[in-house]
Amino acid sequence: MKKYAKYPALAVTLAIMAVIFVLSSQPAELSTKVSRAVTETVQASRIKTITPLWFSTTNLNANVRKWAHIYIYCALGVSMAVTVQLWLHRVTLRQKALLASALCMLYAAGDEFHQYFVPGRAAQLSDVVIDAMGFLPCVAAVYLVLWAVRRLRN
């Protein structure tokens, strides 16, 4: 079964990477329009959630952009961890977790470098840190679950 699961896992990972690339390729004006539309939807729906202290309602648009980074990189982290798990053999879980995290970090840094060349956009180290806040816990969660399953089986 794992033999056939690795191709869809890779396809999902590449699809998420493509979505990130397309969104990062948007000029500043279009990117701002999209995030403002999401912000207006959030404000209109009056979603009540438990949010961290740094989440300020006065600057909701900036926070929507930060959370978008976290969510999309969380998805990338999970899919990358699953893909690495399915494709690599004879490698420890720790090494796989480190590789999945490193690949996500490289993609996040590359994404910021790419944005440097997009009109009106800038490369920011803070965005890479925010991206890491998305993928690191998710990669860790995948490998903690795999570790726990292995411990229960033995």
Residue ranges of model-derived segments:
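"…centered on the first transmembrane helix and the immediately adjacent amphipathic helix/loop
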Residues: 1-80
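Membrane-interface helix-boundary motifs at transmembrane edges
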Residues: 2-5, 87-94
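Alpha-helical transmembrane segments of integral membrane proteins
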Residues: 5-12, 95-103, 126, 130
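Small-polar-interrupted transmembrane alpha-helices in polytopic inner-membrane proteins
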Residues: 15-20, 96-116
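Membrane-interfacial alpha-helical segments at the cytosolic side of multi-pass membrane proteins
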Residues: 73-87, 133-149
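Interfacial helix-loop-helix junctions of multi-pass membrane proteins
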Residues: 108-132
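Short, charged juxtamembrane terminal tails flanking transmembrane helices
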Residues: 151-154
